[in-house]
């Protein structure tokens, strides 16, 4: 708000200072300048108020009267009387004059100058410019000439009031003109430590020196130009001086730069950058030429495909393409290849995918030369590795090629040379880089040296690309679980979108792929929720509600699997077993009974493992040879888990039902082992089947060795199976009867023609098969009849609903329980031990079961004679104990693996997931661990830490 309007008649009255001509340029006088009158000297001069009141008078809305009538910029009367500083706020609201009034005031001021000359030696002049001059000075604030007129910087803050202090001098000669009036008002004093700022345009007497006014506008313009040149020279000298002293040339304090960014500052920055910069186009062209030359040197006239290199002929390539289309892709439609395309055309258009397809066909190639098969694998690996890692090509064809190599990985290698996880990592990176996720891609235009965004390909939204996304996901999940690493692939919303679209597809292959991806997603969740937090020192265990919810999700997926899809059913049950895998650190505690939760967990896990092996056993050898990598890894895990549970149940000190993990587990694993062996014999170049056989045999040998050691530690009778006092008396009576019969007959007590007579733990566990005795004894047959009658008195499992353990602990009925009571297991050995004080060396005993296939002997699963075994002697690591003696049963010792073979086999495989199932004890002996994690594996997680 403006102050009180001037009194009537103030227009005709002037202050004494007006007689000297200072009223013309007084900005604090709100009245317009008027011509002087002749009779003004006769009238008494009237004190006028200031146009801009001080803060105190403005707040009280009263007239602000200067204490010195000759100096309107002097402190007002009220502030002097109140003994306070008179401050003027230039930003306070005031009533603006109309533009027409401003123009009229300027016109009148221009007319009054010729009539009234200014006094040349006036000690003081008006201290304020008019408001219109103030506006023009603000509009010209970006001009560098206005910011360089002062030797020392002025402090100016538009938002703070101005305090009047003595005036500072200036060494720069001013220019006196109508555009730049001079005054004698006090100026602010610069304060050290405060950055230089623009001086207030309302302060007066800033410029001193020559007050000669120009005679015309042209002269005034020339003077302004000379002044600008002078200031530029002065600024350049200051910059040069600062550079010599070592100061930075962009320091505003040292160079007294203005508080705003001036034109000179921007031009200076651009000139600095331009001096040290080259053209962007030149640099781009230079780098592009070097990159093109590098690629030319790498791929200069070198063939890529196997036909051009002469590894295989065109006829062999056509045969392999037919095998892939009809058998591999026909049973597992994952990576499609063009139909009706000949080998020559395929190898020229997509050489890397062609090489990968040729390598995948090695799984079922029967009559090929071994060196040719290995050369195909090496060339397929070399071609994609050079193209990606050396040349730097990124294409969808390479993604497909890496996917085929990951799905049908068939390289004969030890764990130190394994590469399937590296292939998978490159495949994941390529999938991101090629822009399948609708990410824009760019290409370099060498003609004009620019980068242009490629047009979005319509094919990136088709089903083929969605298949690649899902395939890459579940291969990554399987690979990470095999290597015991955190799964770095995530089920993102885009993956969910791809899976949903394929689930609703009209093609059966798309729906099957989506179903398998869903199953792996549940496997991923189970790993992160149930098993990933299980590390040493952390609290393990998941609530029963979470287990039930995950089981419900799995059951929903099972409804979508057909009954004849044995491979999918086997994979499903392996995931279910992984879900219910018991926390062994809580289950297997010494001198404790299993609680209901542990019993249920073991029962569910065992049932799922058996179902997985049963479904896998329904496959033919040819179907097993065609299974991709994820299926075989889950079967190996399931077999190892089942054998570990079986042994740990046998070795528990608590008296529980040993059929909680039934002996059928051993026969099922042996059946799977024979099936894999048969498939490997039919397909000798399928090295992945050879590795599966090796892993399964490693589990079986470890189990057999530990059971024999368990027998040795407990006098050929495990502590769990030792009878109590009442049973001992019965055994003594049977021993006396046995001695009487032996003295009469002088023949063996028991014939090997019995269908099922488990006389020791290995026979009871069905892990060994003995040869039948061709000359059974009639006396032994009569004694066997008496023993059978005694068995019926004790109750066989077929007559009762419970299995009677050594200490008569009732447990629930278990399917496929042994046909004879367990109390008869240690009868002969224990009774003879009681009588004679030592163990009896009995003849080999047979375990015949007409309902199950003949069991395969341990240690005879060897590669074909045409395939030499690698030398594992350099990898000697902890092996089975050599202190266990098998003198009582030399045939068992012959059927067991050589300790050196066992330790070498363990070294070949000890860096993968089965290391969690096997471990070494304090004596460096391989055994089934009683933990869900291997203590040494926590150091393996360096960058792949659990999330």
UniProtKB/Swiss-Prot annotation:
Location(s) in or outside the cell: Nucleus
Region (Disordered): 1-52, 96-222
DNA-binding region per Swiss-Prot/TrEMBL record: 54-86
Biased composition (Basic and acidic residues): 1-10
Keywords recorded for this protein, A-Z: Cell adhesion, DNA-binding, Metal-binding, Nucleus, Stress response, Transcription, Transcription regulation, Zinc
Primary role: Transcription factor required for yeast cell adherence to silicone substrate. Plays a role in resistance to weak organic acids such as acetate and sorbate. Binds in vitro to a nitric oxide-responsive element (NORE) but seems not to be involved in response to nitrosative stress.
PANTHER family named in the record: FINGER DOMAIN PROTEIN, PUTATIVE-RELATED, ZN(II)2CYS6 TRANSCRIPTION FACTOR (EUROFUNG)
Oligomer status and interactors: Homodimer.
Protein's recorded name: Transcriptional regulator WAR1
Species per Swiss-Prot/TrEMBL record: Candida albicans (strain SC5314 / ATCC MYA-2876)
Name of the gene this protein is made from: WAR1
